[in-house]
Amino acid sequence: MAFWETVLGKYIMTMAIAAVPVVELRGAIPAGIAAGLDPWLACGAAIFGNLLPVPFIILLVRQVFDRLRKHAFFAPKIDALERRAHLKGRLVRKYRLLGLMLFVAIPLPGTGAWTGALIAAFLNIRLRHALPAITLGLLIAGSLVTLMTLGIIHLLLSLIHIS
């Protein structure tokens, strides 16, 4: 049996997928469920995996961006990322931690822990304040994605039985 076929391997796979930007828990939860994990345990693994990069992003992204900006190749890309984070940060600027939690809680592309952490870093929200807000947002988003995934599975199964 290959490692990725074991229960531990499936949990690690779910956490690893959730740690990837853009995919995050929106892709990790359906992947974990498809791999045979209990839906709510897949949700928990995805939330944990999605949280892993958050402290590093909040604490280090500005220093990394400042160093990369010194290279002509990276400067325009860094500027574009910062502009995007500031544009998406309007809700967070207005409502601070509640806005950050709500921003992360919406399971749509362009929202989530990675963008929420970038926004927190650029708005100088301290890690000790941002991490609980992002965690609550991920709990909400994870629950929504899990329920939507289960609903889609149920719908597909009912369509198969109708045919």
What are these language model-derived features?
Residues 1-7:
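Histidine-/acidic- and/or cysteine-rich, low-complexity loops and terminal segments associated
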Residues 7-51, 59-60, 90-146:
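Hydrophobic alpha-helical membrane segments of integral membrane proteins
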Residues 33, 61-65, 69, 120, ...:
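Membrane-water interface at transmembrane helix exits
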Residues 41-43, 55, 72, 82, ...:
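Generic alpha-helical propensity signal that fires on short helical segments
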Residues 52-92:
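Helix-adjacent hinge/juxtasegments
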Residues 67, 79-86, 114, 129-141, ...:
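Hydrophobic transmembrane alpha-helix bundles
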